Amino acid sequence: MDAHTIIVAATAIAVGIIFGAAGLGSAIGWGLITSKTIEGITRQPEMRPQLLVNTFIFAGLMESFPFIILAFGFWFLFANPFLG
């Protein structure tokens, strides 16, 4: 196998791992955001509207992370800087 094939194969494996980690991180983030919101609503029900607004703001910020990782992953796949 030549060096080009090895680099392409290693990049494909690495990008798959990166995509999996980004998905797992996003799922954990959603779980933490949701659990803390429910916990806050349980403690102070009158704060429900403010907590929900904050939840959706932080959830939107947290969801941007996998899309940024997706862009970097596709950059490594299709415009691989390691191939020269």
UniProtKB/Swiss-Prot annotation:
The keyword Transmembrane appears for this protein: yes
Keywords: ATP synthesis, Cell inner membrane, Cell membrane, CF(0), Hydrogen ion transport, Ion transport, Lipid-binding, Membrane, Transmembrane, Transmembrane helix, Transport
Compartments (UniProt record): Cell inner membrane
TM segment ranges: 13-33, 56-76
Recorded GO CC terms: plasma membrane; proton-transporting ATP synthase complex; proton-transporting two-sector ATPase complex, proton-transporting domain
Membrane topology classification: Multi-pass membrane protein
InterPro entries recorded: ATP_synth_csu_bac/chlpt, ATP_synth_F0_csu, ATP_synth_F0_csu_DDCD_BS, ATP_synth_F0_csu_sf, ATPase_proteolipid_c-like_dom, F/V-ATP_Csub_sf
Keyword Membrane among UniProt keywords: yes
Gene Ontology terms for molecular function: lipid binding; proton-transporting ATP synthase activity, rotational mechanism
Residues the record marks as site: Reversibly protonated during proton transport: 63
Summary of the function given for this chain in its UniProt record: F(1)F(0) ATP synthase produces ATP from ADP in the presence of a proton or sodium gradient. F-type ATPases consist of two structural domains, F(1) containing the extramembraneous catalytic core and F(0) containing the membrane proton channel, linked together by a central stalk and a peripheral stalk. During catalysis, ATP synthesis in the catalytic domain of F(1) is coupled via a rotary mechanism of the central stalk subunits to proton translocation.
Similarity comment: Belongs to the ATPase C chain family.
Subunit and interaction comment: F-type ATPases have 2 components, F(1) - the catalytic core - and F(0) - the membrane proton channel. F(1) has five subunits: alpha(3), beta(3), gamma(1), delta(1), epsilon(1). F(0) has three main subunits: a(1), b(2) and c(10-14). The alpha and beta chains form an alternating ring which encloses part of the gamma chain. F(1) is attached to F(0) by a central stalk formed by the gamma and epsilon chains, while a peripheral stalk is formed by the delta and b chains.
NCBIfam families linked to this entry: ATP_synt_c, PRK06876.1
Protein name: ATP synthase subunit c
Protein source organism: Acidithiobacillus ferrooxidans (strain ATCC 23270 / DSM 14882 / CIP 104768 / NCIMB 8455)
